[in-house]
Structures are given as structure tokens and as C-alpha cells.
Amino acid sequence: MRVLGVDPGLTRCGLGVVDGSNGRKVRPIAVDVVRTPPEMDLGSRLLRISDAAELWIEQYKPEVVAIERVFAQHNVSTAMGTAQAGGVVALAAARRGIPVCFHTPSEVKAAVTGSGNADKAQVTAMVTRILNLKTAPKPADAADALALAICHCWRAPMIERMARAEAMAAEQMRKYQAKLAEMKKAGSR
């Protein structure tokens, strides 16, 4: 499975592509950071991120895009910019019919380090080790993008099993409710 991991941000948006195979084997394909200057107007910044995402999607052909889920941050404008950057990448994927999954920072940290409270240095060290890289990806946004891709490769089988279980439960509930309605109808005759 080829995954494009995205650490969204207006100033720095990390992009990382990883190939995952059976088990926990992952292989790095590409990593970079899209930068936009703060003095550039918002529309131009989002367009630059969107253009880069579209280029990466065309070039690397991911099967899924994994984006860091924005959570409450102290700085509202930072959270808004992060959400907007993630949104344009999600839209680029959706236009091509590529599934988009969101993972929280703690899910990503737990997947690659074993602790949802790991710091950026620990995440970078583990990404470097897991992918057998000669040098650590820099800046941290690049390492985070790779961590998102790794996290998705490792969590995807569980996510699929949960989705199948939920679908089966919904189907069982539908059948049960239909049978109840049938029994109720028969009882009122």
C-alpha cells in the first residue's frame, strides 16, 4: 500500500510517501516540505500547497492520503491555517477518488514510538530508524509526514476490520428491526 502522509501547515506543509507491505515493513519513497511565506496572501498560500499536493499525487500515485487531524490549539489562527492546508490536500485527493484518512497526533506518536506523548525528537528518531534512513528527515514537518504515512500503513488493517464489523452490525440491526416490524404487523392482525 502506498500512502502519502501530510503534516498540514500554512508555513510548512510536510509531505511524505511510504510503501507498506505485509506486517510492519515500510519503505520510504519521498519526503519534502512545501513552504509558503507568511506575507503571501492566504489564497496564494493555499494554492501553492494544493499545487504541490496535486503534483505529488500525480507523481507518486498513493492509494490513500493520511492527514494529521487538527485538534484544538492555543493559537486559533494557527489551527485555522493548519485545517485549511489539510483541507486543500484532502480536496486534491478526493478529486482523484483517493481515500483520505485522518489520524490524531497522539495516534501517530503511539504508532511510531509506542507513546502518545512522545516529543518531536523521539518521533524523528523512530522514523529514521523504522525507515532505515541514513540521516534524519528535517525539518520536523518532514519527519511527521513520514510518521503519518507509517501510522496509516500499520493501522489500516485494523481500521478495515473495524469498518467491516460496523457494517455487519448495521446489517444485523436492519434485519432485526425488519423482523420486529414483521412480527408487530402479524400480531396486530
From Swiss-Prot:
InterPro entries: RNaseH-like_sf (IPR012337), RNaseH_sf (IPR036397), X-over_junc_endoDNase_Mg_BS (IPR020563), X-over_junc_endoDNase_RuvC (IPR002176). Pfam families: RuvC. Its EC number is 3.1.21.10. Transmembrane segments: none annotated. Binds 2 Mg(2+) ion per subunit. One of its GO terms (biological process) is DNA repair. PROSITE patterns: RUVC. CDD domains: RuvC. Mg(2+) 1 binds at D7, D141. It catalyses: Endonucleolytic cleavage at a junction such as a reciprocal single-stranded crossover between two homologous DNA duplexes (Holliday junction). Its main location: cytoplasm. The keyword Endoplasmic reticulum does not apply. One of its GO terms (cellular component) is cytoplasm. Mg(2+) 2 binds at E68. One of its GO terms (molecular function) is DNA binding. It is found in: Cytoplasm. The keyword Transferase does not apply. Keywords: Cytoplasm, DNA damage, DNA recombination, DNA repair, DNA-binding, Endonuclease, Hydrolase, Magnesium, Metal-binding, Nuclease. The active site is at D7, E68, D141. Its cofactor is Mg(2+). Homodimer which binds Holliday junction (HJ) DNA. The HJ becomes 2-fold symmetrical on binding to RuvC with unstacked arms; it has a different conformation from HJ DNA in complex with RuvA. In the full resolvosome a probable DNA-RuvA(4)-RuvB(12)-RuvC(2) complex forms which resolves the HJ. PANTHER family: CROSSOVER JUNCTION ENDODEOXYRIBONUCLEASE RUVC. Belongs to the RuvC family. The RuvA-RuvB-RuvC complex processes Holliday junction (HJ) DNA during genetic recombination and DNA repair. Endonuclease that resolves HJ intermediates. Cleaves cruciform DNA by making single-stranded nicks across the HJ at symmetrical positions within the homologous arms, yielding a 5'-phosphate and a 3'-hydroxyl group; requires a central core of homology in the junction. The consensus cleavage sequence is 5'-(A/T)TT(C/G)-3'. Cleavage occurs on the 3'-side of the TT dinucleotide at the point of strand exchange. This is Crossover junction endodeoxyribonuclease RuvC. The gene is ruvC.
